[in-house]
Design a protein with these regions (language model features):
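C-terminal tail/sorting-segment detector
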Residues: 2-3, 302-319
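Carbohydrate-binding surfaces in secreted/extracellular proteins
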Residues: 28, 98, 159-199, 229
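Extracellular glycan-recognition surfaces and repeat-rich motifs
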Residues: 34-70
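Secretory/extracellular carbohydrate-interaction modules
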Residues: 65-136
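Short, aromatic/His-centered strand-loop micro-motif at the edge of beta-sheets
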Residues: 140-162
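Residue-level detector of functionally pivotal "anchor" positions at catalytic/ligand-binding pockets or at interdomain
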Residues: 237-265, 274
């Protein structure tokens, strides 16, 4: 009897481990300034690159905190919709977690979604996450002409990093799958009982078998940063715990400049003399100096900045 109980317990543990699967981890560990299509993402609609690599975000106790860089969604061409694939899921739930900083939002539009297989004929962008000009987060199952997105009343802080979790649940039957959205300002290892927003499919779009995540830009004045994307079949795997680094993560570039950020500071490592220019989002030059090779620290307020060197231009986030 004891052996039978042990075997049953081991079988249950094995099944539980098999059911809890990490499908995708994207920490944007690429060179700053690189377009996503050079980093394993696919854009099939021939849009102009509007999403590139910037320095990353931090959210205490989250597994993606402070690893690699981040993706800056900033551009007017909404046909540039980089996709990244994961293993097709046909049952259960898919959880997508990511860090978000909505620094500038000038137009209501969706910036993130799921979809099924990539196709140039079907546009099944499902589980669309929106931001509007009031800095409120919203959700729709499918396109707004079928059903307007639903927005939460909370106004997000442009200088705060949030953890967003999208849950897609596949339910037996046609056009009845459900999406749930969670917005966290502090880490929790347990799935909240009540989501922030929840929608059941009542649109013209068929339910999908998710196998891609999609980023989307819609306005050149928007500055939205996404980082630390985790796709999994359980909350515990998608919203896994981690430790933020005690120092900033170095961001190598394609010239002789390496940088990292810490709260309200930019740190540079130069291998040759370099003229450094920093501009805020209004275009005002807030720092200009020719610096010798070596290490340099520049104090800055929170916000987005354009870092210009003699060879390249980088968009950076100071938290």
């Amino acid at each position: 009897m004891r052996k039978t109980v042990i075997l049953l317990c081991l079988t249950a543990l094995t099944l539980s481990a098999a059911q809890a699967e990490v499908l995708l981890v994207e920490n944007f560990e690429y060179t700053a300034g690189t377009p996503l299509t050079a980093c394993g993402w696919t854009a099939i609609y021939n849009g102009t690159s509007a999403t590139a690599i910037t320095n990353g975000l931090e959210f205490d106790n989250y597994a993606g905190c402070g690893i690699g860089n981040g993706a800056l969604i900033n551009g007017i061409d909404n046909s540039y919709q980089p996709h990244k694939a994961f293993a097709k899921q046909t049952s259960g739930s898919v959880y997508v977690a990511f860090m978000l900083q909505p620094y500038i939002v000038t137009k209501q539009s969706y910036f993130f979604s799921l979809r099924d297989a990539i196709s140039i004929n079907n546009f099944n962008f499902v589980g669309r996450i929106y931001l509007n000009e009031q800095y409120q987060i919203g959700l729709s199952f499918y396109k707004s002409s079928d059903a307007a997105p639903v927005f939460d009343t909370q106004v997000l802080d442009a200088e705060t990093v949030y953890l967003v979790v999208l849950k897609y649940t596949m339910i037996d039957g046609d056009k009845n799958d459900r999406i749930d959205l969670y917005l966290l300002d502090a880490y929790t290892a347990n799935e909240p009982t009540t989501p922030l927003l929840s929608i059941t499919n009542t649109t013209s779009c068929a339910d999908i078998y998710p196998e891609n995540i999609v980023l989307r830009s819609d306005d050149a004045d928007d500055w939205i940063v996404v980082d630390g994307i985790r796709v999994a079949t359980t909350w515990s795997e998608a919203v896994a715990a981690g430790t933020c680094p005690t120092t900033g993560t170095a961001h190598p570039t394609t010239d002789h400049v390496e940088y990292y950020t810490t709260p309200q500071a930019l740190h540079l490592q130069l291998t040759a003399d370099e003229t450094i220019c920093l501009f805020d989002t209004t275009g005002k030059c807030v720092y200009r100096e020719t610096l010798p090779a070596g290490t340099h620290d520049i104090d800055l307020g929170k916000g987005f900045y354009v870092l210009k060197t003699s060879a390249r231009t980088y968009k950076i986030v100071i938290s």
